[in-house]
Swiss-Prot record:
InterPro entries: CAT-like_dom_sf, Plant_acyltransferase. GO terms for biological process: alcohol metabolic process; fruit ripening, climacteric; response to ethylene. Involved in the biosynthesis of volatile esters which confer kiwifruit flavor. Alcohol acyl transferase that can use a wide range of alcohols as substrate to produce esters. Induction: Induced by ethylene in ripe fruits. Keywords: Acyltransferase, Transferase. This is Alcohol acyltransferase 17. Its EC number is 2.3.1.-. Belongs to the plant acyltransferase family. The gene is AT17. GO terms for molecular function: acyltransferase activity.
């Protein structure tokens, strides 16, 4: 597997956070979120990051100034992002469009971009420095809905990091907003090419509710995972190029090798390795939940420009012992089954379930959620410096892994997977992964983490 950068020490100097407001007056109103948006499973902040190289044709342009000004213009059209959430009866979330603004941080780091990105990328290692968690900003209700940090590197490259309140948008909705910012940075004068559409009633629960599906992803079960598996969580990224994917495919029967997508093969491998690494009881029920986009699904006519959540996490269940000891095809069939569940009717069933069951959280015990962000467009956002050398997820969560696109130093395209596991489980995970890829996998202590010094 790919190696990580050597131990580095760098200093990040940040200015005090400021609030960026819409550049023109916007309506003061209340706007309800949909019954997909405000479920418990979306009440968290999700970070993404983009890295840009120095471009000679942009000499003299300050990315901080360029982004800040374009952001203010974009917020005129996406003014709910400048508001704050309030919670009404039955935990219903509503945006109070106050135009208070979004948090913005200007920063400088005494490091070069190529020192952070090499054969692979591990943004979770240094995310806290490139996206400062402003005290008091981490909540869902009454807090800024976006946090942005633009960090300049001494080489002329820079990073754009953003943290989104997930109840407001899914990743595709975020990309639509970022595309609008990018259009303004490149000289758009009037309005975004795709006007934003609110219409959150589009995914409101039906009256009366109708739940024709069994939603394994929301079943509330007793958590029997050992406490040791919940401590000392460690972040790490893994790069899977064509060579690694071929090695994983070799564990499948011939009839599956050519008919299974890279996502199917990779997700089955990760689910198996993670299940083994956590040492779960063989009789324990485990789940694979695949984040699925509802746009384009039969029976769901999503308005063009809609930037709310249009995603669900359909799941399939198996015994941990089957996943960890059976051939890889068992895990892969579970992945394929989870993907196949998603339809427009399924998403509406989720909305009805939320209202009927009090907006439950997704299952925690034995669940593994994967979100493929390789095709959402984060790697195409051009603020005037061209496409980013990396644009994608910035950090995993204990139950959630994200996939991003990445091209290594050899020019080889592949998938970066962000993982979050307890230290001991991460070591076992890498050993299991080594068996699947047939290559050496750097152990968690084979490299020294990047050291950073923060200064305001």
């Amino acid at each position: 597997m790919a190696s990580f950068p050597p131990s580095l020490v760098f200093t990040v100097r940040r200015k005090e956070p400021t609030l960026v407001l819409p550049s023109k007056p916007t309506p003061r109103e209340l706007k309800q979120l949909s019954d997909i948006d405000d479920q418990e499973g979306f009440r968290f902040q999700v970070p993404v990051i983009m890295f840009y190289k120095r471009k000679l044709y942009m000499e003299g342009e300050d990315p901080v100034k360029v982004i800040r000004e374009a952001l203010a213009e974009a917020l005129v059209f996406y003014y709910p992002f400048a508001g704050r959430l309030i919670e009404g009866p039955n935990r219903k979330l509503v945006v109070d469009c106050t135009s208070e603004g979004v948090l913005f941080i200007e920063a400088d780091a005494d490091i070069e971009l190529n020192q952070l990105i090499g054969d692979t990328i591990d943004p979770g290692t240094y995310l806290d420095e490139l996206l400062h968690d402003v005290p008091g900003s981490e909540g869902i209700v009454g807090c800024p809905l976006l946090l942005i940090q633009v960090t300049r590197f001494r080489c002329g490259g820079w990073a754009f990091a953003i943290r989104l309140n997930h109840t407001m948008s899914d990743t595709l909705g975020l990309v639509q907003f970022l595309t609008t910012i990018a259009e303004f940075t490149r000289g758009a004068e009037d309005a975004p090419s795709v006007p934003p559409v609110w219409q959150r009633e589009f995914l409101a629960a039906r009256q009366p509710p109708f739940i024709p599906f069994q939603h394994h992803e929301y079943e509330q079960v007793i958590d029997t995972i050992p406490d040791d598996n919940k401590k000392s969580m460690t972040h790490k990224s893994f790069f899977f190029g064509p060579k690694e994917i071929r090695a994983i495919r070799s564990h499948l029967p011939h009839h599956h090798r050519s008919t299974s997508s890279t996502f199917d093969v990779l997700t089955a491998c990760l689910w198996r390795c993670r299940t083994c690494a956590l040492g779960l009881d063989p009789q324990m029920t485990v789940r694979i939940s695949c984040a699925a986009n509802g746009r384009g699904k039969h029976g769901l006519h999503v308005p063009r420009g809609y930037y709310g959540n249009v995603s669900a996490f359909p799941a399939t269940v198996l015994r941990a012992g089957i996943i960890s000891t059976s051939p890889l095809e068992y895990a892969m069939e579970g992945v394929k089954k989870a993907k196949a569940i998603m339809t427009g009717e399924y998403l509406r069933s989720v909305a009805d379930l939320m209202v009927t069951k009090g907006r439950p959280r997704y299952t925690v015990a034995g669940n593994y959620i994967v979100s493929d962000m390789t095709r959402v467009g984060l790697d195409t956002i051009d603020f005037g410096w061209g496409k980013p050398v990396y644009g994608g997820p910035a950090r995993a969560f204990p139950l959630i892994s994200f996939y991003g696109r990445f091209k290594d130093n050899k020019g080889e395209d592949g998938t970066v997977v962000l993982i979050c596991l307890p230290e001991a489980a991460l070591e076992r995970f890498q050993e299991e992964l080594k068996k699947m890829t047939g290559e050496h996998v750097d152990g968690p202590f084979d490299y020294k983490p990047i050291k950073v010094v923060s200064k305001l």
